[in-house]
Curated annotation (Swiss-Prot):
Matches recorded under InterPro entries: DI19 (IPR033347), Di19_C (IPR027935), Di19_Zn-bd (IPR008598)
Annotated family: Belongs to the Di19 family.
Ranges for region Disordered: 151-190
Stated name of the protein: Protein DEHYDRATION-INDUCED 19 homolog 6
Gene label: DI19-6
Family matches, as PANTHER family: PROTEIN DEHYDRATION-INDUCED 19, PROTEIN DEHYDRATION-INDUCED 19 HOMOLOG 6
Disulfide bonds: none
Pfam families (alphabetical): Di19_C, zf-Di19
Composition-biased stretches (Basic and acidic residues): 153-163, 170-190
């Protein structure tokens, strides 16, 4: 609304707009309440008037000639009214937003919280929960494991020691094998000499 004031020294009137703060506060103070109901399949809170769309899109639920997924009763034409009346104990009401001309600190915190809930509401309506910014404990464990320093040096030293031990044992086996080969050669030579000696003895006896 506007109020008119007369200037000094003249008859000209100038319209100066004024605001009816009482009316503005009454309009701004009217909060809109939204009704939510948990989905019977995925338990995500969905607005009542979006529940049918959510069931059809997310869970392929045929609303035509279907029964209520909660109470198994036949659904009427007004499915929203059915959920509001028959399952009122499942409904949750939330404020959409609030506004005041000079908000205090508590009112400011409340307004910011309700504003966040207002922006998160579409994700609930579409059946997709708002993303959680808290880190996943499983991922944090993997990250900590990847950043941790390697502790393979003792294992490597043990493996090297085992390798040296195996190589030394192989050398010892080769030496023993060589000694055995030398002994077998000596035995073979002795046998050949004995055979040759026996042949000579036989030849001499035959000659006489």
């Amino acid at each position: 609304m506007a109020s008119y004031h007369q200037q000094q020294g003249g008859s000209t009137f100038m319209a100066i707009p004024t605001i009816n703060f009482q009316m503005y506060s009454e309009i701004a103070g009217d909060d809109e309440w939204w009704e939510y109901i948990p989905c019977p399949f995925c338990y995500i809170e969905v607005e009542v008037h979006f529940l049918c769309d959510h069931l059809q899109e997310e869970h392929c639920f045929d609303m035509k000639n279907a029964v209520c997924p909660i109470c198994a009763d036949n659904l009427d034409k007004d499915t929203d009214e059915h959920f509001r009346v028959q399952h009122s104990h499942l409904l949750k009401r939330r404020k959409s937003s609030s506004f005041s001309c000079k908000p205090s600190s508590a009112a400011a915190d409340k307004g910011s919280y309700e504003e966040d809930s207002y922006f998160e509401a579409p994700s609930h309506c579409m059946g997709r929960p708002a993303p959680d910014s808290s880190p996943d404990p499983l991922l944090s464990q993997f990250i900590c494991c990847s950043l941790a320093p390697p502790v393979d040096s003792p294992r490597r030293s043990e493996a090297d020691a085992e390798g040296h031990g195996s190589s030394s044992s192989d050398d010892q086996k080769r030496r023993e094998q060589g000694v055995m080969d030398d002994a077998s050669k000596e035995e073979l030579e002795e046998r050949l000499q004995r055979i040759e000696f026996v042949k000579q003895m036989l030849m001499t006896t035959i000659a006489y």
